[in-house]
Amino acid sequence: MISTRGRYALRVLVDLAEHGGGSYLPMKEVANRQEISLKYLERIVPLLTRARLLEGQSGKGGGYRLTREP
């Protein structure tokens, strides 16, 4: 059985693969599309970043994107 955190992490990765197109997307957009609390995603995204599945950029036009092509 996959944990809730694991399911949500997978949903984030799939969402970025479908909507990212190589550009950085704010987690707020992903949270809204996936109907997941932004606060909960803020706990999951650092794990995906440490695993080198995502990379982040801060500032205007920032957000997260996949480190590899889907």
Describe the predicted segments one by one:
Residues 1-12:
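Short alpha-helical segments that sit at the start of domains
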Residues 25-35:
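A short alpha-helical element within helix-turn-helix/winged-helix DNA-binding domains
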Residues 51-67:
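Beta-hairpin "wing" of winged helix-turn-helix
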Residues 39:
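Key DNA-contact positions within bacterial/archaeal DNA-binding proteins
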Residues 32, 49-50:
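Alpha-helical residues within the helix-turn-helix
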Residues 10-21:
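Short amphipathic alpha-helical interface segments
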